[in-house]
């Protein structure tokens, strides 16, 4: 925030200093400060550690709401070469950083960095697609963090013993993981599909290939979690939590999961009907 404020003051004083201040350099500093504030690579180092110390609802705010203002300001600056570097680093670090994580909050943090790379890439070439992507990402993140918050889930080993006798709820949780990863035909694939179309129209094939490969890595560790949780039963870990299922919260979660899984079909049906 201090860097952002200082750079803004320099930019305002530019005319009074007989143009001795390089405007592009000042804009680059402002852009770097905004990328730092949004948690994009290579300024992401604070983000996973901050996420680890927050409650799930506060973590959700950090992953979604706190990114709106920086992204809006970045869309006005749009220094493409700096954005391109941040996009490449964000999708790579967001994918690789989540591979060996056992903390769900850090896993969601690196997933957020990866998704932020997709948003920044769409922001480079379109003023509206990144908003659509942000909306769907916020919804899918809310569905997962809502369930994590209800059952106080913070580590992967808790998922292995979670709902041993309730396979349906466990199944819906991992479908939401795959939807967040952008696997078709779930709802999370729709914003990625829009970004892919936009980058294809702009002939950004190298960037698009790199982003899709990073998404495959994120899907790999999501699928690894799903496989481990379904194929193995850790009955000795059942002491981790006593499940007091609040029916209203569970019903709300299942409704949101329905939209997460079948949302793409519903939107496609609505599109072809009207």
Curated annotation (Swiss-Prot):
Listed GO MF terms: NADH dehydrogenase (ubiquinone) activity
Q: How does it sit in the membrane?
A: Multi-pass membrane protein
Asked whether the UniProt record includes Plastid among its keywords, one would answer no
Q: Which UniProt keywords apply?
A: Electron transport, Membrane, Mitochondrion, Mitochondrion inner membrane, NAD, Respiratory chain, Translocase, Transmembrane, Transmembrane helix, Transport, Ubiquinone
Broad class of where this protein is predominantly found = mitochondrion
What Enzyme Commission number(s) appear in the record?
7.1.1.2
Gene Ontology cellular-component terms listed: mitochondrial inner membrane
The residue ranges crossing the membrane are 28-48, 54-74, 79-99, 107-127, 128-148, 171-191, 206-226, 254-274
Would I find NAD among this entry's keywords? Answer: yes
Report the catalytic activity. Answer: a ubiquinone + NADH + 5 H(+)(in) = a ubiquinol + NAD(+) + 4 H(+)(out)
Q: Where in the cell is it found?
A: Mitochondrion inner membrane
Q: GO biological process: what's one of them?
A: mitochondrial electron transport, NADH to ubiquinone
Function, in words: Core subunit of the mitochondrial membrane respiratory chain NADH dehydrogenase (Complex I) that is believed to belong to the minimal assembly required for catalysis. Complex I functions in the transfer of electrons from NADH to the respiratory chain. The immediate electron acceptor for the enzyme is believed to be ubiquinone.
Which family, according to the similarity comment? Belongs to the complex I subunit 2 family.
Its name, as the record gives it, is NADH-ubiquinone oxidoreductase chain 2
The scientific name of the source species is Drosophila sechellia (Fruit fly)
Upper classification of the organism: Eukaryota, Metazoa, Ecdysozoa, Arthropoda, Hexapoda
Its encoding gene is what? mt:ND2
């Amino acid at each position: 925030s201090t860097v952002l404020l200082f750079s803004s003051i320099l930019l305002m004083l530019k005319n009074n200093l007989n143009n001795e201040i390089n405007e592009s350099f000042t804009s680059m500093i402002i852009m770097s400060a905004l990328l730092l504030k949004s948690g994009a690579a290579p300024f992401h180092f604070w983000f996973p550690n901050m996420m680890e110390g927050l409650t799930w609802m506060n973590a959700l705010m950090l992953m979604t709401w706190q990114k709106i203002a920086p992204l809006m300001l970045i869309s006005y600056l749009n220094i493409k070469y700096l954005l391109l570097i941040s996009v490449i680093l964000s999708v790579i670090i967001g994918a690789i950083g989540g591979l060996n994580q056992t903390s769900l909050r850090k896993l969601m943090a690196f997933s957020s960095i990866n998704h932020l790379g997709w948003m920044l890439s769409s922001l480079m070439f379109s003023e509206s697609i990144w908003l659509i992507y942000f909306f769907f990402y916020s919804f899918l993140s809310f569905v997962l963090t809502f369930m994590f918050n209800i059952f106080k889930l913070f580590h992967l080993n808790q998922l292995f013993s979670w709902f041993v006798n309730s396979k349906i709820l466990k199944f819906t949780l991992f479908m939401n993981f795959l939807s967040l990863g952008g696997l078709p035909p779930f709802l999370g694939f729709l914003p990625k599909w829009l970004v892919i179309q936009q980058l294809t129209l702009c002939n950004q094939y190298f960037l698009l290939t790199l982003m899709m490969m990073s998404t495959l890595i994120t899907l790999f560790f999501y699928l690894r979690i799903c496989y481990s949780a379904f194929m193995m039963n850790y009955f000795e870990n059942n002491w981790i939590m006593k499940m007091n299922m609040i029916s209203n919260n569970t019903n709300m979660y299942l409704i949101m999961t329905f939209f997460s899984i079948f949302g793409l079909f519903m939107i496609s049906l609505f599109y072809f009907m009207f």
